[in-house]
């Protein structure tokens, strides 16, 4: 499944903006997240398709525009975790959950090493005591690493 050219352009623009905004902001780079906390797209799809697997709460922590264009079905949008508003939304969404709840965070706005959203979201959940958090490893962007690989896609809010 090939992504329409306008979506590719939007992913590229958001990637460039994210890189520009986060250059030098090493504390928020996804590359600082330990490999043990990552999950690959194929692993997540197997979990979602298995009738016996515990289904995670999936939270998109990036741009609303990207979420409405394409997201993982069943995932929830809470806002960019690079902003305090997004982090507050994340905390509010999970505050009543058991601390061992299986949660998957993802963004996909730009190349992994420059993502401004997944590291703050991961840090916030771990600071709250969550112990079963995984970050979806998206090497380039959501379009290339999820949509174009034919994984399930939802659209709209």
Question: Where on the chain are the PLM-derived regions?
Answer:
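Rhodanese-like catalytic fold shared by cysteine-dependent sulfurtransferases
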Residues: 2-38, 68-157
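A short, well-structured juxtamembrane/interface segment
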Residues: 35-50
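Flexible, charged surface loops at secondary-structure boundaries
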Residues: 49-53, 96-99
């Amino acid at each position: 499944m090939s992504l329409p050219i306008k979506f590719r352009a939007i992913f590229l623009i958001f990637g460039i903006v994210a890189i520009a905004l986060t250059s030098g902001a090493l504390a928020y780079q996804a590359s600082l997240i330990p490999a043990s906390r990552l999950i690959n797209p194929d692993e997540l799809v197997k979990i979602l398709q298995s009738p016996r697997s515990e289904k995670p709460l999936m939270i998109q922590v990036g741009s609303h525009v990207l979420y409405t264009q394409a997201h993982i079905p069943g995932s929830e949008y809470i806002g960019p975790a690079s902003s305090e508003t997004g982090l507050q939304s994340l905390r509010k969404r999970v505050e009543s959950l058991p601390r061992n709840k299986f949660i998957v965070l993802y963004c996909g706005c730009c190349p992994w090493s420059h993502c401004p959203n997944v590291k703050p979201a991961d840090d916030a959940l771990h600071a709250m005591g969550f112990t079963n958090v995984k970050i979806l490893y998206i090497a380039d962007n959501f379009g290339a690493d999820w949509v174009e690989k034919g994984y399930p896609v939802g659209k709209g809010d």
